């Protein structure tokens, strides 16, 4: 047991350093997003005053080009404040604040990710990025290229990637995972208990997790299919990545709740594009070129290193617990 703790303490030094840097980068992305939407010209001919009713998602509806006076800037600010509120919750809870939670790895060689949302977020975000990179590497070695959907306007695209995590987590986690889990495992009917279980499914008394895992995998596959199913979707190469991401997000939702899964999803969308657009604007280069910038490559390396350490520590815990 002592040897295990010493190994985890040793690995914990670079691991907690990487998680702390990732946390800082996530925090900095909030003002970057505001700067991009309100202080740059990524929209070319349009800006943050562009009416929400003119978006193509409302085409062929009565809402399209109606007199409803709300702009994408208004909705973006609402989303921004909402995500910031969830971000603050993730730092402080549910039982410990972030810095106290990660410091236990170095001090005693033990940790409990369930004590703090941000610990779980930074850890599983790193693992998700690592697995996505591995899938992409394997697919490209077989000539399978992942092509993103074509966006007519960078401002509208950034708005969509900011909105998508909230909508997709509500559909694919709360509706398709949370409610079925409650139906399968709840022993009592109560509105308060129902809402608590949707917020944190681990509140359910899940003794046999086989059905829960099957449900998470099934919904993960649906999540992957949804990313390639439409004419303006990603290319087929995205299916494996999105499926793996959906399964990880489903597992995170089961273990840690909607706060963690939502912010991980937000980070893979808003966070990545915020930095890419920022690089694009300050260097006067296209978004495609910005994604190949040394800063973006450094961010990827940071997540990969953190993901590798996270998986090593996970396996160490499982191995030693099994043999104690």
Model-derived features: positions:
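Alpha-helical transmembrane segments and their helix-start/interface "positive-inside/aromatic belt" motifs
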Residues: 4-26, 71-76, 109-126, 256-259
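Non-cleavable N-terminal signal-anchor transmembrane helices
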Residues: 1-61
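Transmembrane helix-loop-helix hairpins at the membrane interface
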Residues: 155-324
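Alpha-helical transmembrane segments of multi-pass membrane proteins
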Residues: 20-47, 77-79, 85-95, 131-141
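Alpha-helical transmembrane segments and their membrane-interface junctions
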Residues: 31-34, 125-147, 217-237
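Alpha-helical transmembrane spans of integral membrane proteins, capturing the lipid-embedded, hydrophobic core
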Residues: 21-26, 78-84, 117, 121-133, ...
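Juxtamembrane helix-loop-helix connectors linking adjacent transmembrane helices
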Residues: 43-75, 93-208
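Alpha-helical transmembrane segments
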Residues: 84-97, 308-318
């Amino acid at each position: 047991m002592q040897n295990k703790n010493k190994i985890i303490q040793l690995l914990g030094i670079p691991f907690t350093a990487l998680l702390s840097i990732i946390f800082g980068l996530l925090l900095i992305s909030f003002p970057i997003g505001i700067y991009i939407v309100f202080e740059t010209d990524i929209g070319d001919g349009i800006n943050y005053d562009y009416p929400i009713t003119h978006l193509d998602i409302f085409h062929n509806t009565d809402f399209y080009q109606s007199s409803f006076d709300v702009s994408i800037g208004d909705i973006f600010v609402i989303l921004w404040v909402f995500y910031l509120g969830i971000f603050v919750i993730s730092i402080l809870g549910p039982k410990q604040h972030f810095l106290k939670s990660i410091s236990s790895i170095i001090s005693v060689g033990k940790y409990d990710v369930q004590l703090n949302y941000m610990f779980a977020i930074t850890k599983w975000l790193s693992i998700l990025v690592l697995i996505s990179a591995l899938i992409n590497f394997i697919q490209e070695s077989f000539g399978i290229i992942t092509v993103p959907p074509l966006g007519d306007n960078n401002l509208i695209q950034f708005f969509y990637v900011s909105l998508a995590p909230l909508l997709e987590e509500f559909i694919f986690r709360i509706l398709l995972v949370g409610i079925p889990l409650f139906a399968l495992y709840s022993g009592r009917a109560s509105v308060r208990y129902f809402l608590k279980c949707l917020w944190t499914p681990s509140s359910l008394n899940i003794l046999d997790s086989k059905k829960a895992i099957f449900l998470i995998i099934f919904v993960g596959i649906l999540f992957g299919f949804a990313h390639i199913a439409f004419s303006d979707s990603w290319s087929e190469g995205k299916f494996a990545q999105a499926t793996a991401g959906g399964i990880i997000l489903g597992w995170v939702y089961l273990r840690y709740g909607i706060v963690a899964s939502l912010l991980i999803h937000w980070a893979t969308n808003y966070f990545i594009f915020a930095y890419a657009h920022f690089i694009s604007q300050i260097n006067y280069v296209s978004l495609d070129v910005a994604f190949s910038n040394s800063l973006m490559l450094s961010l990827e390396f940071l997540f990969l290193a953190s993901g590798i350490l996270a998986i090593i520590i996970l396996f160490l815990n499982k191995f030693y617990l099994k043999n104690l």
